């Protein structure tokens, strides 16, 4: 795994990066805080059994905000990742306007059809577009999960319907 995170306004992003890496280490893994995207460094870190924890950063302009969704997408594509997982405040793609249930999985073609007939909040559309970009650029699956749910990752991966929505290119790519 590779962790890309956002840093709340007013918080030192490098200190936050170190804090997240330390939290992972307290869970029994090795983690290393990294700034920026360098595929060779990521491969080296992973091959030495470390989890890279990345804070999006522009070395030339540290005050410039870089969207972690953009960074995560770039890394997933460059690393030829199998999965890209966005932890958000959304539980996934709602099946209807009542927001009572989400699609456990949906193809990119089905997403395009939904976008023609349904209105999605602007910030959710950003997640959805990043997922679509990911699957069209070679990532097999892109997940939208509610990061506020405790144990959301194991629920997503070890239950039949999961905990959110996985966007796939087509049905054949679900279990590649």
Locate predicted features.
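Anionic-ligand-binding alpha/beta catalytic cores of soluble enzymes and soluble regulatory domains
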Residues: 152
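Conserved, well-ordered active-site substructure
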Residues: 101-104, 155-170
